[in-house]
């Protein structure tokens, strides 16, 4: 089987992290985001994976060659010279996706969930249509494009309603699909949207179905959602692989700590925290709902909440970071500084308070 991951461009929504590391390699749950997807595809029997990118970061090539060996898959880049939307990349990767008659998976690289690829493939085969969209239920459907089903046929999609004013349903497109190779024939080689141009044709042909996703789902493409997604992910791990979480007298709730990290006995970590390799946490530090990336240090008596601390960064003593603050790579926050919703660019040193949302350049 085959899979296409829509990686896209420069990950601008996740800046400042993506100023130094390509978005697919930013660690989510202490593993590069894209590795969650490659592993799930490989476990479902996928052997050919295409990454649809606008640029081909050389740093990604090396990492992905390692994953090819580890998971026994072939990973190729499909590089767009101009952005091709969400359907154009399928046409561009036609050679790989149509190399046999088996269906192929398509997924958005920002989506983190319990990827149901095996069940999705079985469901797709059983209904015999040309495409299946994974659907997730949401509390506020008025913000999204909502899937409306055919009354007579279970799971057959009748239409999509964009940001409905009145309630028509609560299932939305989760950004994961399985499609038959002939669907590529419906796509032209130009900027095209799979959601607004390709799927309506399949709906008209009565050949597009939806599959309900169990468990959590999150588009983690921006810092606020990256943190919310981390909460959901850790909750899922606590149920399915509790041994991956860290326990201890100074650990509260769901916390994942790399074994190489050093945490002072009087620090308190959690709930909903991920701490990366070679991180140092000082005495009396309090961390909640945050991600601390590798080689960083949080010094004594600082409070860190709803924050992403970038690689090789240092938070001084008696600091307070909150309000979806994001420190880029190699940032220094001096002692006794308050940062509330600051986005601090790489290699910056800050010694003044940031009382409200701001970009520190």
Swiss-Prot record:
| UniProt cross-references to InterPro entries, sorted A to Z | GMPPB_C, GMPPB_N, Hexapep_transf_CS, Mannose-1P_guanyltransferase, NTP_transferase_dom, Nucleotide-diphossugar_trans
One annotated GO molecular function is: GTP binding
Q: Where in the cell is it found?
A: Cytoplasm
Say which enzyme class the record assigns. transferase
Question: According to its UniProt record, where is this protein mainly located?
Answer: cytoplasm
Highest taxon listed in the record's lineage: Eukaryota
- Substrates-to-products reaction catalysed: alpha-D-mannose 1-phosphate + GTP + H(+) = GDP-alpha-D-mannose + diphosphate
| Keyword Transcription tagged | no
**What are the record's GO terms for cellular component?**
cytoplasm
Under the heading Pfam families, the entry gives: GMPPB_C, NTP_transferase
Q: In which pathway does it act?
A: Nucleotide-sugar biosynthesis; GDP-alpha-D-mannose biosynthesis; GDP-alpha-D-mannose from alpha-D-mannose 1-phosphate (GTP route): step 1/1
Alphabetized UniProt keyword annotations = Cell cycle, Cytoplasm, GTP-binding, Nucleotide-binding, Nucleotidyltransferase, Transferase
Q: Which GO terms describe its biological process?
A: GDP-mannose biosynthetic process
| The keyword Cell cycle is annotated on this UniProt entry | yes
Q: Which SUPFAM superfamilies match?
A: Nucleotide-diphospho-sugar transferases
Report the PROSITE patterns cross-referenced here: HEXAPEP_TRANSFERASES
The protein's Enzyme Commission number: 2.7.7.13
Supply the CDD domains for this chain.
Answer: M1P_guanylylT_B_like_N
According to its UniProt entry, the function of this protein is described as: Involved in cell wall synthesis where it is required for glycosylation. Involved in cell cycle progression through cell-size checkpoint.
Concerning its family, UniProt says: Belongs to the transferase hexapeptide repeat family.
Q: What is this protein called?
A: Mannose-1-phosphate guanyltransferase 1
Q: Which organism is it from?
A: Candida glabrata (strain ATCC 2001 / BCRC 20586 / JCM 3761 / NBRC 0622 / NRRL Y-65 / CBS 138)
């Amino acid at each position: 089987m085959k899979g296409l991951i829509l990686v896209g461009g420069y990950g601008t929504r996740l800046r400042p992290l993506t100023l130094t590391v390509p978005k697919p390699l930013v660690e989510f749950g202490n593993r590069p985001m894209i590795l969650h997807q490659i592993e799930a595809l490989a476990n479902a029997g996928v052997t050919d994976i295409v990454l649809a990118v606008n640029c081909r970061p050389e740093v990604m090539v090396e990492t992905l060659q390692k994953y090819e060996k580890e998971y026994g898959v072939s990973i190729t880049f499909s590089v767009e010279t101009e952005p091709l939307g969400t359907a154009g990349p399928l046409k561009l990767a036609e050679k790989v996706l149509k190399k046999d008659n088996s269906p192929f998976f398509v997924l958005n690289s920002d989506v983190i969930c319990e990827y149901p690829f095996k069940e999705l493939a079985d469901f797709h085969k059983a209904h015999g249509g040309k495409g299946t969209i994974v659907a997730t239920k949401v509390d506020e459907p008025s913000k999204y494009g909502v899937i409306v089903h055919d009354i007579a046929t279970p799971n057959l999609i009748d239409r999509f309603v964009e940001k409905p004013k009145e309630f028509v349903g609560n299932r939305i497109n989760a950004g994961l699909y399985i499609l038959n190779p002939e669907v590529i024939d419906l796509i032209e080689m130009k900027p095209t949207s799979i959601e607004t141009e390709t799927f309506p044709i399949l709906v008209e042909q009565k050949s597009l179905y939806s599959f309900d996703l169990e468990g959590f789902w999150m588009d983690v493409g921006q810092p606020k959602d990256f943190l919310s997604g981390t909460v959901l992910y850790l909750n899922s791990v606590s149920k399915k692989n509790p041994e991956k979480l860290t326990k201890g007298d100074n650990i509260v709730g769901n916390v994942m700590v790399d074994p190489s990290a050093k945490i002072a006995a009087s620090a308190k970590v959690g709930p909903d925290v991920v701490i990366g390799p070679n991180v140092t946490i000082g005495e009396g530090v309090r961390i909640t709902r945050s991600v601390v990336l590798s080689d960083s240090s949080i010094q004594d008596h600082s409070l860190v909440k709803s924050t992403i601390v970038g690689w090789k960064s240092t938070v001084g003593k008696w600091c307070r970071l909150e309000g979806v603050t994001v420190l880029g790579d190699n940032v220094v926050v001096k002692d006794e500084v308050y940062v509330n919703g600051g986005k601090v660019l790489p290699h910056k040193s800050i010694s003044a308070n940031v009382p409200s949302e701001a970009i520190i350049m």
